[in-house]
Amino acid sequence: MSTNQIILTDQGDNYVNVWSHVAQDLYNHYGETLYNSWFSKVNFIESSLNTVILCAPTNFVRDWIKSKYSMVILQLFQHYNNTIKSIEIITKELPGITQTVIALPTKTFADIGSSELNAENIFSTLDVRFTFDNFVVGAPNELAYAAARAVAESSGAVSESNPLFLYGGVGLGKTHLMHAIGWYIKQNNPSRKVIYMSAEKFMYQFVKALRNKEVISFKEKFRSVDVLMIDDIQFICGKDSTQEEFFHTFNTLIDNNRQMVISCDRSPSDLDNIEDRIKSRLGWGLVADVHSTTYELRLGILESKIEQMNVKIPKDVIDFLASKIVSNVRELEGALNKVIAHSNFTLKEITLENTQNILRDLLRSNERIITVEDIQKKVASRYNIKLSDMSSSRRLREVARPRQIAMYLSKALTPKSLADIGKKFGKKDHTTVMHAIKKVEELLENDIELREEINLLMKILQN
């Protein structure tokens, strides 16, 4: 963790030192990605009447910290100094920090000379089903939703989250949010130039431009927009030429205060076969994780969809779908559509028994199959370590112990052999896995807290 810039005031060094401890505790508790997104640019300003005043870099960061972390921060301050009664988080320009905004020369679509860049064609790539109005918000996606709204509502200026990096599994709503940003801008600020595109299509158009000697037109197309949204950026991993072009496009847009929104199936730090300089830039702004859906969120999604379709579905059927279709939102909505279509075509009433029969094959595929990769991701997240640490040889206790726990769970919850498990952990041999399992078993005999922790991890993975 890099050391924060500390601003000394006439209140003395005491509160400054306390803030440095609090910042370290936040880093240790929440991990590098979340710390860098929210706390790394927060500074101690002063203290007044037992109130600590902190400064956040933007209104968005200030409001999010206030709503989510203010009580935790206060408790940490009080742990080190019990005279502190409250905290206040403000935003203001700090002395010595200046912002330079370089405006791009304004171009119209006609200036660019590409039929692909007229507004009608750009917005024709957006799915009419994906708007903010029909996006169901819950705990797993509330940060991503709030950040996407902030980008869309930035009224022509760059948002406070630039770039916005959305990551998570398939079918959890990343693409929905990107389309929603596009539609919001179309309806409220149609003069802004927006491109939404998959990383695969970006690569295809770049290769085509190289072949047709139209690279200059390609560069103008992507570097003159107000908002560039690239979906599934992991596709350019290992594609050196495309990475190089993306790197320069990224720099041009960010340097000229243009907005970028990027989606991926993993966090920037977990991307393989991509240049470090690109990894670094992807994490410059706000990194928002879209988690797997909870039962409550799935229930909300189904109820919203049913209301939109103006159909009647028995409550026990809705509960059944929310409980059994747990993989992703796309499959959940597909299951609902299948049940409704079957009823419309056969004129049969929608009942729980009929639903179970209609979705028999889908339900079988949704039975929970736990993989070593699932275990590694969940344990890494639980202990705030990088996923790459699972296959590393680092021996620090804070890395080695979670890795041993993941090996133990892999043996307990999957049919994999010790040798197969070892391959998943950086090609370690079976004796290393055996030693890890034995070590955890020994600890479990006397460590009640660890026993409860592993039981909790098992329940999370199995459900």
From Swiss-Prot:
Keywords: ATP-binding, Cytoplasm, DNA replication, DNA-binding, Lipid-binding, Nucleotide-binding
Sequence segments annotated as region (Domain III, AAA+ region): 125-343
A GO molecular-function annotation: lipid binding
Subcellular location: Cytoplasm
Region of interest called Domain II, as start-end residue ranges on this chain: 83-124
Disulfide bridge positions per record: none
Residues noted as binding ATP in the record, renumbered to the chain: 171, 173-175
Any GO BP annotation: DNA replication initiation
One cellular-component annotation, GO: plasma membrane
Family named by the database record: Belongs to the DnaA family.
NCBIfam families reported for this sequence: DnaA
Assembly and interaction partners: Oligomerizes as a right-handed, spiral filament on DNA at oriC.
Xref: HAMAP family: DnaA_bact (MF_00377)
Notes concerning its domains: Domain I is involved in oligomerization and binding regulators, domain II is flexibile and of varying length in different bacteria, domain III forms the AAA+ region, while domain IV binds dsDNA.
Function noted in UniProt: Plays an essential role in the initiation and regulation of chromosomal replication. ATP-DnaA binds to the origin of replication (oriC) to initiate formation of the DNA replication initiation complex once per cell cycle. Binds the DnaA box (a 9 base pair repeat at the origin) and separates the double-stranded (ds)DNA. Forms a right-handed helical filament on oriC DNA; dsDNA binds to the exterior of the filament while single-stranded (ss)DNA is stabiized in the filament's interior.
Cited PANTHER family: CHROMOSOMAL REPLICATION INITIATOR PROTEIN DNAA (PTHR30050:SF2)
Protein name: Chromosomal replication initiator protein DnaA
